[in-house]
Amino acid sequence: MPNANALSKKPSSNIIGIDLGTTNSCVSVVKNGEPVIIENQEGERTTPSVVSILKDEVLVGSQSKSKILTHPKNTVFASKRLIGRKLEDPEVKKYVKGLPFDTTSHCNGDVWIKVDGKKYSPAQIGAFILSKLKRSAESFLNHSVVKSVITVPAYFNDSQRQATKDAGRIAGLDVVRVINEPTAAALAYGLDKSARGNIAVYDLGGGTFDISILELSDGVFHVKATNGDTFLGGEDLDNEVVSFIVKDFMEKEGIDLGRDVNALARIKECAEKVKKDLSSSVVSRIDIPYICNVGGEAKHLSREITRSEFEKIVEKIVNRTIEPCKKALADAGLDSADIKHVILVGGMTRMPYVRKVVKEIFGIEPSTEINPDEAVAKGAALQGGVLAGEVDNVLLLDVAPLSLGIELLGGVFSKIMRRNTTIPFKETQIFSTSEDNQTDVDIKVYQGERAMAADNKYLGQIKLKNIPPLPRGVPKIEVTFESDANGMYRVTAQDSVTRTPQSLEIIPSSGLTEKEIDRMVREGEELKNLDEMKRRKAEVTISVGELLRRGYNELRKAPEDSLSKLRKVARGEDFDLEETEQILLDVKKAISK
């Protein structure tokens, strides 16, 4: 039976903008020069970044969020905090201990998620979310969608950016540009305004914090400096509240709930509610009946948390955003008095205490004109509109979040591209050999701000061979660093005599292999086909129910054996889709005569 709502196979020219968030994700597209938020299939403007991997289906969004309590081992949330990260990273190691689902180390040291014995990369979890957003966009546009702009925290390193691009590829998206979240928010804020001068974008989301200082002038968005913390956000606030409640219950009842996965999941759900409640109220109540059972006696958790009490609990977390803001101002060569506007991005910025801290940092009231949950996706869509030629008179000049350089003699880190350098970028520096008659040189590339190379993130190396054997210091070795607008890097080295270049396109060691990506793409297609089959079956079941509710005089025109099969479908029995679609078509024809 043909589907009247089927998509056109012809891809559209639209480039969708996606905010792949830690807590929620959002998709937007430019229509008539303006960014429009696209609702998902549930009619929501944002989609919870939660994925439930069950026996016979994968759920994403609100459907999945409800499974956190019933299927905590199968339900993955905040996977963005793990993307492009190593399990042995101290931050990651500490964080995963509090997760209800299992994690494991992949063969390259990456942290992966384990569900029912099967391993999933964080990029693959992200791809499940992106696939849902892609389907929502295709339904809205009535076209297949291929190209996208995806945002990342400004302080994401190269590995995390590449892993995000991998997630897009697994979801069937061509990620034409990766842009920083604060920059995207600035685009959404400044495009339809005559805003000029220096602005600060304070972005405190579910898992990350970014601060960016930009200069706006006549459609030019020039990022002057950026700073942040990729492991600071609403998840940390929730965990502080959970710890407070667990400790309080221990003191009152002598029972440690910290070892009970289901109890912790219920408390975390309440912690999120408390956080939201206290953004608009001065008190929030927690009531969790039957939180545990001791000696046959059911225990209940019930207490109130006031706003002042809550602010004391989360104070140290929020105050961690102050120092990055000061550093960003210093790197931009500005004082707080030079900032004309402060934009708030991320759900956490709805908290009165956060707004109070922001006002103290910059000395002005932050702007609340834009929706902090939607601004980033709108900005990404605008960047997509610029790339597609749908939005004119906008120039975006972003910066590199971290320095890039090479290791010198003695393990010293020599920065070639310093952090907050405007990209695209190209820089060449001259180096030489450290020994007489040296014919080979290993050029090791690192990313970071530490003085010694070993303390920074290793990205790869170039082996330059056949250097003319000369006294040390005589050969001239040219090392060139290039960065494209996506913040992806290429390093080229050559000696001045042979002029034979050796280059390294930096594909992060923590990225997925081509084989792994291809496998995940195939699995994604299989799930997509399964989802499509379920959707069609649901539509047929509804059509059968509507048909069987018709009057007797109509239905008696149809063959009884066909009606009998349709009644089985209506009773919830399994059925062959193609056969039932044909029966439905035949019965409709019969009764219309």
Swiss-Prot record:
It holds the Pfam family HSP70. InterPro entries: ATPase_NBD, Heat_shock_70_CS, HSP70_peptide-bd_sf, Hsp_70_fam. This is Mitochondrial-type heat shock protein 70. GO terms for cellular component: nucleus. May act as a chaperone. PANTHER family: HEAT SHOCK PROTEIN 70KDA. It is found in: Nucleus. Keywords: ATP-binding, Chaperone, Nucleotide-binding, Nucleus. Its main location: nucleus. It comes from the Eukaryota. One of its GO terms (molecular function) is ATP binding. The keyword Isomerase does not apply. Belongs to the heat shock protein 70 family.
